[in-house]
């Protein structure tokens, strides 16, 4: 990742939506919906970056489906059994557990580490790639990835290269978000062109802030603010978010970053935790609305 490229030069407003499972999808949807109700519309950003769970949020934000998805999510949240259909199975094969274990235990994103995770993901006995695309299409619709502002991140499961999908990729929103959300071991890597792509967070970052470097202002929604103590995990090294944010600010970009209140890792893919995520996101948005209204001017 290089901030020297200044991919956001010339942009006034940018936003990046980070990964964090079903919980963070719900939190971000509620946060953005509450901001919109307070007169803060994020849809006008000239660069919208989505990674993993955040790719779904980026897709619905740029396609004008935010309010509809928020209403539907709030309704099904009352019935956790319905949400459970969108979560991965708890009965995992040994090959799935191997890939998932490598991902969870990785405290950095050295190329050899990411390749090992990717190869294990390719070898895992997961549900079909098409099944994940059908699930993401419920959220994104079946349209093309065509918005010029949108960038969806993923990782080549064989080479460990980062791939940034935009309108030129010639794919659908459902396929791009499925690729970005294909957690190693839980979901199959997704075919995009001649590649098999996995979760964009298997890259040492959940927000890819270099893609907005040089923009005048950037809103960053991240699962973590980088201040929590403890070892690295899921290819993210301790303190890496703070390093990434500092590098972005060094390009001249003014940053407003927000994370949810602390949550347990076990809640991230738990359907029963979605009502908590919705309430938390709305509450934090109300607290931030005045400050963000001035920032997002």
Q: Model segments located where?
A:
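Patatin-like phospholipase
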Residues: 1-51, 56-297
């Amino acid at each position: 990742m290089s901030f020297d490229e200044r991919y956001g030069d010339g942009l006034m407003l940018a936003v990046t939506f980070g990964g964090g499972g079903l919980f963070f999808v719900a939190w971000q949807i509620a946060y953005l919906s509450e901001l919109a109700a307070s007169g803060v519309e994020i849809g006008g950003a000239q660069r919208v970056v989505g990674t993993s769970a955040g790719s779904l949020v980026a897709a619905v934000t740029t396609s004008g489906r935010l309010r509809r998805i928020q209403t539907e999510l709030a309704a099904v949240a009352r019935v956790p059994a319905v949400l459970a259909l969108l979560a991965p199975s708890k009965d995992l094969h040994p090959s799935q557990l191997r890939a998932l274990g490598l991902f969870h235990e990785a405290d950095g994103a050295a190329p050899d580490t990411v390749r090992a995770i990717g190869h294990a993901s390719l070898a895992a006995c997961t549900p079909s790639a098409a099944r994940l695309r059908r699930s993401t299409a419920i959220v994104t619709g079946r349209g093309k990835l065509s918005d010029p502002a949108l960038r969806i991140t993923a990782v080549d499961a064989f080479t460990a290269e980062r791939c940034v999908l935009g309108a030129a990729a010639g794919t659908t929103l459902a396929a791009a978000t499925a690729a970005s959300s294909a957690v190693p071991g839980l979901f199959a890597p997704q075919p995009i062109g001649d590649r098999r792509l996995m979760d964009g967070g298997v890259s040492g970052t959940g927000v890819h802030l270099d893609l907005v470097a040089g923009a005048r202002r950037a809103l960053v929604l991240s699962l973590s603010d980088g201040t929590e103590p403890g070892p690295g995990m899921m290819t993210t090294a301790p303190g890496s978010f703070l390093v990434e944010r500092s590098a972005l600010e060094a390009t001249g970009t003014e940053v407003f970053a927000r994370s949810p209140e602390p949550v347990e890792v076990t809640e991230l893919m738990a359907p029963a935790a979605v009502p908590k995520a919705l309430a938390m996101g709305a509450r934090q948005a109300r607290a931030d609305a005045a400050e963000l209204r001035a920032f997002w001017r």
